[in-house]
């Protein structure tokens, strides 16, 4: 039976991000889990929750499964997945437009702007930060129709300011919270060619850190699990998994 799949969503989101993306994996026989990160479900609060909290929850879920899973993370969830991968045995690790770990510098002006703009909110690391439609439209949902963007944004929830600070301002973090240790699982990193918030040049650095295969999806942007072309991205993941399994047989 194929290995189970655990899907990890990014900032401001929930497991619903993968409603379509999970379908090809289920059709291939995988049991798929797409949990909400801590505080992201109904009635939850993300204030004060850090990246290590998210990662420990995901690692615990992975270790509780009957066999090592395929762990797939998108955006900030890609960084959560990297951290979890150092604490749980995995069949494979797949990162979709991942936030980079500690030590990987951004390669675009947009990355720098997103990191510094949060300081306009004051001590944002103590708060849960509300999603911003203009930013979501510009950086994440830019290839979707207005109706699709509005529908996705309506489901977004506040994100932990602490987790955002640890992710976007890692060079100011004396605890090196998002430093990723050795990952033994085979890894694949995908980047959207039009992504400006986690562009290919940044994602490639992450892949090099992991010794991972790296692929650019030329026509895609940041919302890989749900924007046009998501099905091709899922197929690429499944093809890579199949080739890995065949090589190991």
Regions found by a protein language model. Give the residues of each.
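Catalytic active-site module of serine/aspartate enzymes centered on a nucleophile-bearing elbow/loop
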Residues: 213-249
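Conserved alpha/beta-hydrolase "acid-adjacent" motif
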Residues: 196-202
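Active-site loop/oxyanion-hole signature of alpha/beta-hydrolase fold enzymes
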Residues: 39-69
């Amino acid at each position: 039976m194929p290995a189970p799949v655990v899907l990890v969503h990014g900032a401001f989101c929930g497991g619903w991000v993968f409603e379509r993306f999970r379908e090809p994996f289920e059709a291939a026989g995988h049991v798929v889990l797409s949990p909400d990160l801590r505080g992201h479900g109904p009635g939850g609060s993300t204030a004060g929750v850090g990246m290590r909290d998210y990662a420990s929850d995901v690692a615990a879920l992975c270790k509780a499964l009957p066999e090592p899973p395929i762990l797939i993370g998108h955006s900030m969830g890609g960084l959560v997945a990297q951290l979890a991968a150092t604490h749980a045995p995995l069949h494979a690790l797949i990162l979709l437009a991942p936030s980079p770990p500690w030590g990987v510098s951004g390669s675009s002006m947009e990355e720098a702007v997103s990191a510094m703009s949060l300081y306009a909110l004051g001590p944002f690391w103590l708060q849960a930060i509300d999603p911003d439609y203009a930013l979501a439209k510009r950086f994440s949902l830019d290839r979707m129709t207005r109706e699709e963007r509005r529908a996705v944004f309506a489901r977004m929830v506040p994100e932990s300011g602490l987790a955002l600070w640890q992710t976007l301002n890692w060079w100011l973090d004396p605890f090196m919270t998002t430093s990723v240790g050795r990952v033994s699982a085979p890894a694949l990193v995908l980047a959207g060619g039009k992504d400006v918030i986690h562009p290919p040049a940044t994602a490639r650095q992450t892949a090099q850190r992991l010794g991972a295969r790296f692929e650019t999806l030329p026509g895609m942007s940041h919302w890989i699990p749900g924007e046009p072309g998501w099905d091709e991205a899922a197929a690429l993941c499944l093809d890579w998994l199949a080739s890995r399994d065949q090589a190991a047989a």
